[in-house]
């Protein structure tokens, strides 16, 4: 499956991230059953990563690049685009499909 992007609320439909730009995001990460495992919103601190530098899972790289600034979306990410057979011990089980509620706040 890879990553499926479902728009929750639209962005500007003009400003899309490019490689080597820093994406400033808010997110909530959940397992497929809805169990939350992480949230930048809970910390009230946006998360930043540079696109194309493999700082995040493949599902984020391929999902966020499809978003425009201001857009909020649901990313459903298959295990092979997330943490695969290993998972993330104590947080994400092996072979887990992940669901993220993400918002692209701005680009730097």
Curated annotation (Swiss-Prot):
Ranges for domain PPIase FKBP-type: 20-108
EC numbers for this chain: 5.2.1.8
Entries under InterPro entries matching the protein: FKBP-type_PPIase, PPIase_dom_sf, PPIase_FKBP_dom
Catalyzed reaction equations: [protein]-peptidylproline (omega=180) = [protein]-peptidylproline (omega=0)
Keyword tags: Isomerase, Rotamase
GO molecular function: peptidyl-prolyl cis-trans isomerase activity
Gene3D superfamilies attached to this UniProt entry: 3.10.50.40
Keyword Hydrolase: no
Superkingdom of origin: Eukaryota
PROSITE patterns: FKBP_PPIASE
A GO biological process held by the record: negative regulation of activin receptor signaling pathway
Pfam name, any one: FKBP_C
CC per GO annotation: cytoplasm; sarcoplasmic reticulum membrane
Entry similarity comment: Belongs to the FKBP-type PPIase family. FKBP1 subfamily.
Cited function: Catalyzes the cis-trans isomerization of proline imidic peptide bonds in oligopeptides.
Name of the protein in question: Peptidyl-prolyl cis-trans isomerase FKBP1C
Source organism of this protein record: Homo sapiens (Human)
């Amino acid at each position: 499956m890879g990553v499926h992007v479902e728009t929750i609320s639209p962005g500007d439909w003009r400003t899309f991230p490019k490689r080597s730009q820093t994406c400033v995001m808010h997110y909530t990460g959940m397992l497929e059953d809805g169990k939350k495992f992480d949230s930048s919103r809970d910390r009230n601190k946006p998360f930043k990563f540079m696109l194309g530098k493999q700082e995040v899972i493949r599902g984020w790289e391929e999902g966020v690049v499809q978003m425009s600034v201001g857009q909020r979306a649901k990313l459903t990410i298959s295990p092979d685009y997330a943490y695969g057979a290993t998972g993330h011990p104590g947080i994400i089980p092996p072979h887990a499909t992940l669901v993220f509620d993400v918002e692209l706040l701005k680009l730097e």
